[in-house]
A protein has these predicted regions:
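Residue register of alpha-helical TPR repeats
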Residues: 13-17, 56, 96, 134-136, ...
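Amphipathic alpha-helical segments of tetratricopeptide repeats
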Residues: 3, 39-46, 79-86, 120-124, ...
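Residue signature of alpha-solenoid helical repeat architecture, marking inter-repeat boundaries
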Residues: 9-13, 52, 92, 130, ...
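Hydrophobic positions within repeat-based interaction scaffolds
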Residues: 3-4, 32, 238, 254-320
């Protein structure tokens, strides 16, 4: 029993370390461990006294399920988060449950509802709550994916001001990447690369986190791909391809994972750009099977049921 308690304490410390460093995983705490450890540890934290730890741990677990490609389990967990928050009359819990719902919608490409969930989450958090900054990053990312760039920048500006005050904050790299992606989408690749180089400098000199390296490489490749498209620059296309292949090697163990699918989709665009249509088609067929389409419809039904529950509950008077 003592040995189990010691192990549980070590696992909880490892998970809390991920949360404090604002990273989804690390070399010692991979995705599968986050899921299994949280299943064991979260129930021990389910009380008003430890509600922040409890709901944040569950949020990290939802992210882990999404990254692993288990969207159905992520949706179930988001539903459980919301029900727990309601049972505990926890405004903080409802905020994080909404963020989890938003992440599940984002992964399902239901962007309007994802945005609505994120804004609901923001409504339940005070402006100076540390969770607010992470949420602003997610809202900016989503708005950029929706091509609502100027709206996205209204969320990036307070993040930039926050970063000026706390340049070594754990969200520094995600905030710099938000700036970079804005400039990639705006067609200013040189400015985007400058932000990515700043992020890389923090990674090289301070964080050394695999998740940070992955994000920096992914968006640097996107920048190179845009440069290749704008200037028909084959060298940049080759550099982008080399980065995508490097990243795919890291995630090829699970072809259902969000990262594998995102990078494969980027490779499709790149191959089309290079006129390598057969290779683009091969990847497309691997990614988009009939089974997957059916699964996607099932996810959408699940997620709509979850949001419907939330909207009905919203009409009930709740005292915090």
């Amino acid at each position: 029993y003592k040995r189990q308690t010691h192990t549980d304490n070590e696992h909880l410390s490892a998970l809390q370390s991920l949360i404090s460093r604002e990273i989804p995983y690390d070399a010692n705490t991979p995705i599968d461990s986050i899921i299994s450890w949280t299943n064991r540890l979260a129930p021990t934290l389910k009380s008003p006294r430890t509600e922040e730890s409890y709901f944040t741990l569950l949020l990290w677990q939802v992210s882990a399920y999404i990254m692993r490609g288990d969207l159905s389990l992520a949706i179930d967990r988001a539903r459980y988060m919301y029900e727990s928050a309601k049972d505990m009359n926890s405004s903080f819990g409802i905020a994080l449950a909404n963020q989890a719902i938003g992440q599940a919608y984002t992964a399902s490409y239901i962007q309007d509802k994802a945005l609505s969930s994120y804004l609901d989450a923001l409504h339940h958090l005070s402006p100076n709550n540390p969770q607010t900054y992470r949420l602003l990053v997610k809202i900016s990312t989503l708005l950029q994916q929706m091509n609502r760039l100027e709206e996205a920048m209204t969320y990036v500006k307070p993040l930039n001001q926050f970063l000026e005050q706390q340049p070594e904050h754990p969200l520094a790299i995600p905030i710099l990447i938000e700036n970079a992606t804005y400039y990639i989408s705006s067609g200013d690749q040189q400015t985007a690369l400058r932000y990515l180089q700043k992020a890389d400098s923090i990674y090289q000199n301070h964080t050394h986190e695999p998740a940070h390296e992955f994000s920096i490489d992914y968006y640097t490749a996107a920048c190179y791909r845009a440069l290749a498209a704008d200037g028909h620059d084959k060298q940049k296309a080759d550099e982008a391809l080399a980065l995508y292949n490097k990243l795919l090697k890291l995630v090829s163990g699970n072809k259902r994972s969000l990262e594998y699918r995102s990078i494969s989709a980027e490779k499709i665009y790149l191959y089309k750009l290079l006129g390598r249509f057969d290779e683009a088609c091969r990847i497309y067929q691997e990614l988009y099977t009939v089974t997957d389409t059916l699964a996607s419809k099932s996810y959408i039904r699940q997620i709509n049921a979850l949001k419907a529950t939330y909207q009905i509950d919203e009409l009930e008077p709740v005292s915090y």
